[in-house]
């Protein structure tokens, strides 16, 4: 049909629909122009409401396009032409709109993008580079913002949050490659919230032929590096440098290189092996093949450049650097060895997709180009898009002159130099287009010799200068040398003087592999009806004729015409045929890439859908049990378990299970378990056994943690197992794809072999994922029986210790349980010791207070216990209205340990003071001998004076000042009396009162814990402050009854003994601290059943 349409001028269905719609839009324009800005903006919400009511996009298309045209005129000052509206309608119909260069494709895109963004599902505009992405988003974004729609820009190396925002906008502008990479990365995340893309709804591709045709052969690959020995690449590179032209053969058409017999012999000698093509040397053959291609096929400044000591690939169609791209399968490393730059690790494919399969996932796909009609059949076959040619707004005035052909490249370059020099002297601007960077360097040197000022634009220049260089290419006297990247997507506007001199002259120096590329270069001139001229200079030594025509025969025939132009029509026909031949070859190559990718596409879709299910599902229990069923079925199905008769050998089965899986599922199988079981019931029996083991695993896991933790654990196991095995599967498929062509020699279809083998490999992948997932779950320590019993977990002390425990994510749950249990036991043991000390203290009775039991002193207002005061005992019930956090907010664990450690010391000192006091109350006899102290006496017989002196000495060792704040707390603490003394406070007589008052000045008090007093600091301050006041009277008394020499000796002895005792207590306290590690910050110790003294 397309063939007859070309000659009969039959319009396509899309074109007929578009022309009718254009008439209705023009009729609506006279009503829309009367709307105010506010009314025009409100149309957006009006259209959205219509869609919610059930209207379809095609139902509101005419009015939406009329509104978009008016908004464009008001914001940009440019009213879209009818041909631009016509092109926009064709785009909305899902076809390719071919619009000649300079016809305003960017403005054409506004209306269809606006219409499809109204659905709220997002509209994406794909461009060929980041410069056009930013330019179009900024310029066209003004119109969309005016109409109330948001616009986002997506670029490489952006933060994921910024990418997520860009995709969430109503309209997103992005480079085409980044769209594919974001899709692959989204299917590698561990949580749905990490994804950046949303539904692939609508995509408009600018320069659609460049993306869907020219770059379709190169798949998008996300790879990870693997550390390889770089010496192997250098070794292969050195060998290739020793070869002569007779040692290898090069196929120019397929760019394949093979060793001849002499080359193989040299390889055997160089690597000191017997047979290069022995299976054990297959890796070496692979290295040599890559080194040969790097040296004999891939050329610097053609396929790649060296920039900043790195290999940068060059796009053969645009001349631009393909940033972030590299060759796979070791070819990149071979080129790096050739150019003597740093060899990067060879990569392993982690995820891959082709442009064809990615863009076919959009609900609606359309595109614009200046040259797409020649590839219409490919657009129809692969993308189901028809190419419709949009008429120009003004007739084309450019002259396309016939090609000039020369016998040699030297003659061609001389003719190009003379023509450029002539045009420069005339003042007519000229754009010299080259197919390769190498060619642009040649003409650059020629023009330097001729003293012609010029500008060079190729992949070696900064991209930021591209727009500026192209903008100046149309002024009078401008000479610009550029690769095929020149002006792609940009506008060259000739000056008024240049138009008077004939407009822009486009001079091509080589025929491209596709007629589309040549037409794109011609289209730089003659935009919007401007005058201009285009012409190609070609030779019989150009790459096109050498690869796809019988150029040797042509060279022999036309050798006599060296130095002059060849005007043979048959030769021009040969060039055109060579272009068609290479176009067909490239189409077959793209079709083959798509066919092979279609095989893995089905597998990829299934894996990615299952992966998304894991990310959003909570039914991990069901998934695991299904995998157990697959796991058991595969185990039992192994043929080694069967006898020759076909019946199962249960002993072999049990031996196999115990050898391969018992260590993972923590269960030893016994042949007795399988007695009286029919072969048909074997799978169900083993499945039941494994499920019972799993149920026990699950019960143990729940005892250790909660269901949410278990679900997350299963999720991570399943995701990691799926991802790891999918990566391995992709690499296996890549190797299969590389080697499958060898089956052609056995008269087999490579594609069919790839499909069959790939299907088997995928089935193995599913089984492997299930097998490994089940074993990983069973082998996890999470299912082991918990070390911490339910009784311990219910203990408030354990709950307090657990709340302050810092979990280490790098340790297993069992190891963390051991640490937590050890800490709990240490804390419990220590607190039990403290409680025992408190009980012993309560059992001690003061002799002086025995007479006070029957007449307790009534409590005063300051002494009575307030509603916020509380003594913590094992039976205490805490009022929930009391802020217990305030009690302990300043407690330091060091204070807690010091207080508990010194309790016994303080008790002994109190006892000694009581004995001293009792001695003082008895009548004294003036016997000097009684004041002397025998140094050899046991400590039990030391006199009361010496004990008093010891107390005074200990107190005087480390005098400490009490701050004002602590003194205030001390005053409050003094008002609080121990509970066991409250019933003994009122003496029966004045003498008893005086005795008690004297005792109170000597004996340190232990305050009760209140909400106003921080117990650790109060106890410490109370004891130290009172210790400073106690010794004064005693020191004086000792001086009166003891000689100085004896007192001095006693001081030395007492100090030495106390120092040793203090050191021992310090060591004991440090050991305890080392066992119990608490956070350094202040903690809330809710000790509900412990009394602290």
UniProtKB/Swiss-Prot annotation:
NCBIfam families: PRK09200.1 (NF006630), secA (TIGR00963). ATP binds at residues 84, 102-106, 491. Its main location: membrane. GO terms for biological process: intracellular protein transmembrane transport; protein import; protein targeting; protein transport by the Sec complex. GO terms for cellular component: cell envelope Sec protein transport complex; cytosol; plasma membrane. It is an enzyme of class 7 (translocase). Monomer and homodimer. Part of the essential Sec protein translocation apparatus which comprises SecA, SecYEG and auxiliary proteins SecDF. Other proteins may also be involved. Residues 837-869, 904-1062 are annotated as: Disordered. It comes from the Bacteria. It is found in: Cell membrane; Cytoplasm. Residues 904-937, 944-971, 978-1062 have a biased composition (Basic and acidic residues). Keywords: ATP-binding, Cell membrane, Cytoplasm, Membrane, Nucleotide-binding, Protein transport, Translocase, Translocation, Transport. It comes from Mycoplasmopsis synoviae (strain 53). GO terms for molecular function: ATP binding; protein-exporting ATPase activity. Coiled coil: none annotated. Its EC number is 7.4.2.8. This is Protein translocase subunit SecA. PANTHER family: CHLOROPLAST PROTEIN-TRANSPORTING ATPASE, SECA INNER MEMBRANE COMPONENT OF SEC PROTEIN SECRETION SYSTEM. SMART domains: SecA_DEAD, SecA_PP_bind. It catalyses: ATP + H2O + cellular proteinSide 1 = ADP + phosphate + cellular proteinSide 2. Part of the Sec protein translocase complex. Interacts with the SecYEG preprotein conducting channel. Has a central role in coupling the hydrolysis of ATP to the transfer of proteins into and across the cell membrane, serving as an ATP-driven molecular motor driving the stepwise translocation of polypeptide chains across the membrane. The keyword Transmembrane does not apply. It is a peripheral membrane protein. The keyword Transit peptide does not apply. Belongs to the SecA family.
